[in-house]
């Protein structure tokens, strides 16, 4: 084995298998691009993004860890979100939750 070497099993890996998901349409109403990382609590993203914010409480983007989605000014796109796992306690971000979901 080489340090850092990955030895994956054969076949495809399904991210977030069996976790609840939600599909939302998001529009960037601002004049600057907004980029959202894979583990950011979607409910608390930039206010220039318009969508059903309350429905996204407790969800994040359903994308691979370390990646992001960018919303250009005036752009509207549909994204899939996945429920946060673990203890479902959220601190930081925009400070809108600061505790248990």
Curated annotation (Swiss-Prot):
PANTHER family: UREASE
Keyword terms, alphabetized: Cytoplasm, Hydrolase
Pathway: Nitrogen metabolism; urea degradation; CO(2) and NH(3) from urea (urease route): step 1/1
Annotated catalysed reactions: urea + 2 H2O + H(+) = hydrogencarbonate + 2 NH4(+)
Residue pairs linked by disulfide bridges in the UniProt entry: none
Keyword set includes Hydrolase: yes
The protein, known as: Urease subunit beta
Enzyme kind, highest EC tier: hydrolase
Subcellular location per the Swiss-Prot or TrEMBL entry: Cytoplasm
Primary location: cytoplasm
Subunit structure as annotated in this protein's UniProt entry: Heterotrimer of UreA (gamma), UreB (beta) and UreC (alpha) subunits. Three heterotrimers associate to form the active enzyme.
InterPro entries cross-referenced by the UniProt entry: Urease_beta-like, Urease_betasu_sf, Urease_subunit
Organism domain of life: Bacteria
Protein family per UniProt: Belongs to the urease beta subunit family.
Record carries keyword Cytoplasm: yes
CDD domains on file: Urease_beta
This enzyme's EC code(s): 3.5.1.5
Any single GO CC term annotated in Swiss-Prot or TrEMBL for this entry: urease complex
Gene Ontology molecular function: any one: urease activity
Gene Ontology annotations of biological process type: urea catabolic process
